[in-house]
Regions:
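Long, ordered, helix-rich scaffold segments
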Residues: 4-161
Length: 161
């Protein structure tokens, strides 16, 4: 799987990924290929993937989860900046309309925790204040993510002091 991610940084990456898909047609191979395809640092690829996450997905929870796992890369922070806000805009609907398993996978993969910034924490805390207790999984997930993000911010602040 790691070699597929590495391929994306090489010349002829798309052809190499296609060859890997032919070489390993198993479920594991399909999931690895989806992670790799969604990891492409291209705005159109990210937009199409986000819409699929919100819509029909990639055919199954496992394949969709794999694709979501390839979406966020810390080295793509500028490209992914709009999706931090979109996460908060879409979260309530995801938790209201989708299965528990999907909602949890969506949150774990797409919460913008790679952006260890006070602004993201503040936005997440404000959002938490608006979430109904009728969505306990979302409330709990936000509390846990906020705690993790706050610890990461404090660690970075300490490291630079």
């Amino acid at each position: 799987e790691f070699r597929r991610v590495l391929f994306r940084s090489l010349d002829g990456a798309a052809a190499r990924v296609e060859e890997e898909k032919r070489r390993d047609p198993s479920d594991r191979g399909q999931r690895a290929a989806l992670r790799c395809e969604v990891s492409v640092p291209d705005a159109a690829v990210k937009a199409a993937a986000w819409e699929r996450f919100k819509g029909e997905g990639y055919g199954s929870l496992h394949l969709t989860s794999a694709a979501m796992g390839g979406f966020q890369w810390y080295c793509q922070r500028e490209l992914l900046a709009p999706y931090a806000e979109r996460f908060f805009e879409d979260a309530t609907g995801v938790f209201q309309e989708r299965t528990h398993e999907f909602s949890r996978a969506w949150f774990v993969a797409l919460f913008p925790d790679f952006r260890v910034e006070r602004g993201v924490l503040d936005r997440s805390q404000r959002f938490l204040g608006t979430v109904s207790e009728e969505l306990p999984t979302l409330v709990r997930s936000l509390r846990e993510a906020n705690d993790d993000l706050e610890r990461a911010i404090k660690c970075r602040e300490f490291a630079t002091s």
